[in-house]
């Protein structure tokens, strides 16, 4: 695995070790962009959690940017996306007026003021992208 952001990793399938790694976008979370405050912390946290570890990747399709969409689970079954939100490294955004899949983890992290939830100026990535565009 290789991490390129707080919600994006490159994974290599076990069944095809010679194949190129696949870019995976974690479903259900949105981490700060690399160029925005908290972006480096989110990327480092995800790296520390998954780098050089065997992971399970249930996929859900491909997004408009060509990234595979899916979950990311460690060998012990723990959900990496849930952990990222619970530790205050990512948001679980609402979708079509429905709560995000990790709403409970986000509420708890906010209540405990963990990570980016301790910063009253922390800006959700979708608002950052709307205001500033993507990182170069």
Stretch-by-stretch model annotation:
Residues 1-136:
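Small beta-barrel nucleic-acid-binding modules, primarily SNase/OB-fold domains
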């Amino acid at each position: 695995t290789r991490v390129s952001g707080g919600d994006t990793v490159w994974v290599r399938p076990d069944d095809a070790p010679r194949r190129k790694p696949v870019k995976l976008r974690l479903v259900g979370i949105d981490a700060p962009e690399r160029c925005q405050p908290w972006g480096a912390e989110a990327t480092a946290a995800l790296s520390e959690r998954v780098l050089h570890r065997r992971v399970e990747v249930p996929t859900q399709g491909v997004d408009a940017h060509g990234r595979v969409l899916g979950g990311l689970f460690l060998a012990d079954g723990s959900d990496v996306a849930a952990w990222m939100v619970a530790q205050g490294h990512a948001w679980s955004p609402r979708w079509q007026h429905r709560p995000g899949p990790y709403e409970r983890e986000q509420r708890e992290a906010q209540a405990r003021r963990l990570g980016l939830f301790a910063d009253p100026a922390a800006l959700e990535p979708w608002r950052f992208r709307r205001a500033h565009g993507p990182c170069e």
